[in-house]
Amino acid sequence: MSLFKTTRLFQQHGITDCGPCCLCSLAGHYGKRVGIGYARRISATGREGTTVLGMSEGAKRLGIRLDAVRTDLSEWDSRQWQELPVPAIVHLSKSNGLQHFVVAYGTSADGISYMDPADGLMHECSFESFSGECSGVFLLASKASDFSTVPTGTGNTRFLLSLIADYKRYILVSFVCSLLIMAMSFAQALLSGWVTDRLAGQGNMEIKYISLVFLGIVTVLFGFNAFSIGYHAMVSKQIDNSLVGRLCGHLFRLPASFFDSISVGEVVSRFLDVSRIKGYVTEGLSGLALGGFTVIGTVIVLFSMSLPLGFCAVGLIPAYTLVCWHVNRYLKRNRTQMMEAQALMTSGITEHVAMTMKTRQLCWQNGVSEKLQKAYERFTSVSYGGMVRMRYARLLIQTVCSIATIFIIVVSSFYICIGVMSLGKMVVAMTVFTLYVSSVVSVIGFVISWPEIRSAADRLSDIMSVEQERQDGIELVSGKSFPVEFRDVCFAYGYGMKVLDGFSFKAFPGKITLIRGRNGIGKSTTARLILNMYDADSGEILIGGISVRDISTTSLRKTIGYCEQPAALYNASIRENILCGQQWTDEEVERVLRRTGFDLSRFSLDMMVGEGGKSLSGGESQRISIARMLIRKPQILVLDEPTAFADADGTACIMDILREERDSGRTVIVISHDDRLDTLADHIFNLR
């Protein structure tokens, strides 16, 4: 039996993950474990969410058949709802305007039972309430003939265990250190009780020797704690460097389709997830170990003194667990609401800050300000609910602790009065109980944070499980030009409309090939396919008669120079934007800049271009982009709208560059609307 059992409960990581979570839930229902990240990819979930077609195609790859049905719910009564075939994915239109998917697993006379990815829990509600948000679109699920229960994707538990296995030596040292700290704390408590009894019984003893013993214990405790702090800091740094290094190394080798389905904010948040996981592996596990050892030791000590004292300590555990369960159940839903509110607020701020000039032109400042304020108020109102629950939980825990402390004082005092317990034992009981309370609170804090840590591990494992671009393959001959050929190429982004449908053309060395067509017809997509940024759905893309799928990605992209539109510049100097890690002299950099007509008298190579090149005009940015391509001396040139930001002089300069590159025997492919380039082209292909 597999250690990692399948489940039907999945909570979405982001606001667009409800569709993939429903696929994971269905797979779990049929006994197959699937990761959310994998479900996102096979369903072509993008930044706007998942389409019904994407859900159907993704389910097909899992061996599940989904039959889409649309119906008018105004004619449905309770009997028709009860006849709904389950399981089924149901589309909801929420009152806040968001589109949502849930999985219905059962119906009865009382209502419908469904799994909601918003909180990852099962819910039951009446048919009347459910139909108020249901759009009438159902995806009826059934197992296909090729269904297999072989797990697909990486689960968060497996990913966390792999991390723990990588750092098991450090974790073991932390456990030993926690055990020693607990032992010294208990030794201090027992010694306090012994000293109290000796003082109360004899009234005369060598206090200085006892003081030295206490000082020794405190010194040893300080040493262990200081070592623990330093050790945790060292391990935290190593885990940070290791995880961030692995994430960066993996992230920039992923296919372009991955970045189509995820926002920049989501990628940045994965780096924050590294910090959460690091805290769990270092401080969390060692804190859990120290707390666990202390709880066990306290229960043993108190039971050895008195059964009521032991039962008092044990009784706190279910009380704390109940509080923890209640808070976790609320926070699970609250986290999703915060995620939705934060996503809406962040997207609004990003959009309106980027459009600030247009907002001023339209005199819409007040409207935008009110819109952003409402989004922020919704976010704060949602976060306020979670904050209040947490504070009430802490207050409840403190109250329970106070009651338990009073109980221990009363019971200990009663035992002292009847001569069953000494004053020293009471001191021991109070001291270890104080340790017990702080340890239980620490363990509860770990338990409360566990769902967030698990989600962070799941989100990070989703990225780490994405297959990288193929790095091996045939190496193209350096310095040689190759023909580029498309044979009946078809391509679509995700499961959307076809961008290219049976497109064919051939570009030859020593020739300029011009590709024209209206906006959105697939001209820029053609350039990305040549670079093997995406895989064609069908057809062949050949470089020198070799399929781009068989060519080494590094070799392919070194052979091809690509000038994109608009120019993509880093927030760095002009020199760094042209070199991009390569070793060229300043003289060579200046030479290619002069070829493009860049005015070196106005700008130095050390000038920072700003974020996205905002310190430069569009024409200047385009010249730097062309210079960056030329300095690498590629044998195949692909230029996307090279004259878009150029004036008459700039266009003439670019046309001269194209002639020179053609005359030197290179393969030149130009994508443009500019009619002036028609006279320059040797072959013209129109995309329709």
Where in the sequence are the language-model features?
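Catalytic Walker B motif of ABC-type/P-loop ATPase nucleotide-binding domains
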Residues: 637-641
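Conserved "ABC signature" C-loop
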Residues: 567-608
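Cytosolic ends of transmembrane helices, especially the final helix of ABC transmembrane type-1 domains
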Residues: 341, 361-364, 388, 435-463
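Membrane-integrated ABC transporters
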Residues: 1-188, 201-210, 228, 232, ...
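Helix-to-loop junction immediately C-terminal to a conserved catalytic motif
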Residues: 531
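Loop segments that connect adjacent transmembrane helices in multi-pass transporters
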Residues: 249-250, 254-266, 337-387, 457
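Transmembrane helices of ABC transporter permease
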Residues: 178, 210-221, 225, 287-337, ...
